[in-house]
Amino acid sequence: MEGGTNDGAAVPGNGAGTAGSIFWWLKNRCLGRGLCVDPARDNFRTMTSLYSSIHPADSVNLSTRTHGAVFNLEYSPDGSVLTVACEQTEVLLFDPVSSKHIKTLSEAHEDCVNNIRFLDNRMFATCSDDTTIALWDLRKLNSKVCTLHGHTSWVKNIEYDTNTRLLVTSGFDGNVIIWDTNRCTEDGCPHKKFFHTRFLMRMRLTPDCSKMLISTSSGYLLILHELDLTKSLEVGSYPILRARRTASTSDMTSTSSDTRPSSSPCHNSDLGPLFEKHMSRSSQREGASPRNSLEVLTPEVPGERDRGNCITSLQLHPKGWATLLRCSSNTDDQEWTCVYEFQEGAPVRQVSPRCSLRLTHYIEEANVGRGYIKELCFSPDGRMIASPYAYGIRLLGFDSQCKELVDCLPKEAGTLQVIRSLYSHKDVVLTTKFSPTHCQIASGCLSGRVTLYQPKF
């Protein structure tokens, strides 16, 4: 924790208590420490230590290379299947344990396949530049379960709320669309437009589905708090919780239409009435955030304070503690990977609340493969980050010991530590993914090769 305080030491005034005391036990329990909270924690710690011995193991090559670049990788929740989204309309399926090819969905879509999302161990969804989403069943891959129509431009990513069984998609048309998979038929699923913003790049849900994060090519990050997917958000129907130009300096909170940036991704509506609505609701609820309240941020990016940037990739910590961004400068001459901690709790002053995100760690990336989005990811326990780096990948940690984020939060933003660099491709790596169950990483590159990495002793 901050200041390098040991868990067992008594800290005056912070209520931590001494080792073995009830306050010490409660503090560690709140942080998720101890077998009574997370029985898998020690297992994940052991698995993380194995990544220091990881090497390229196999390449899942095919006899023909017609699928083009690899844009996305996704494991099934039980780790038994690895799916690959490809440039040339195809989806590939592999057994990640044996590295054997299972099947090729040769005409999964009519254009590039951008993203794959498993709904459970057998059902998965794919989205494409052909503006559609397709649902598939691993038990019957000869045909799609159904095709979903609703977007008007390239569909770029898919999220899924396991509690409500609602599918959430976003695309370059600026729309976030909700699909009710509970009432899915061969003709599709009932759907509705949930949100719209300009310059949309990526959309993600936090693990508990309490927040939606949206990144934009104009450098803005939108956060919908107290998320309710059952309500569509039309212009003026949601309160603006916070709107800030920066995430680390002065409280430049927009309180009227005069202070809104001209390139703001919000709707073309005056922010003044929306802020007044929010403030009145906030006073009634004693500072609690209203449902679907919107926060607009410009995340701090090292080296980019005086220039615009594009947030090309967006991921969430598996425990919901932080968000992971890959940013590139508007001139495409720099790329950064940044980690931002969620700062929860009611603000001290509602008229000038603190920002929800704080930059904790960052690292500069190799500036190769310009114009292509590089998809990075967290490990299943959130201790490590796998990030595409030129013709390989880098494993990054919050410190050299791969501690959890909550155990090594710095007072000021620090550099991510390179745990291991792995180079096994002959072209620019575009995507990487950790297996949810095995000590394995997969990566895919621009020329279509998929490589698996496993420990070797």
From Swiss-Prot:
Q: Pathway it belongs to?
A: Protein modification; protein ubiquitination
Q: Where are the WD repeats?
A: 65-104, 108-146, 150-189, 195-234, 306-346, 368-406, 424-457
Q: Name one GO cellular component term.
A: Cul4-RING E3 ubiquitin ligase complex
Where in this protein does the record put region Disordered?
246-304
Compositional bias annotation for Low complexity = 246-265
The record's Gene Ontology biological-process terms are:
protein ubiquitination
What's in the keyword line of the UniProt record? Repeat, Ubl conjugation pathway, WD repeat
Q: Where is the composition biased (Polar residues)?
A: 281-292
- Does the record's keyword annotation contain Glycosyltransferase? no
The role this protein plays is: May function as a substrate receptor for CUL4-DDB1 E3 ubiquitin-protein ligase complex.
> What protein family does this chain belong to?
Belongs to the WD repeat DCAF10 family.
Name of the protein this chain belongs to: DDB1- and CUL4-associated factor 10
Organism in which the protein naturally occurs: Xenopus tropicalis
The encoding gene: dcaf10
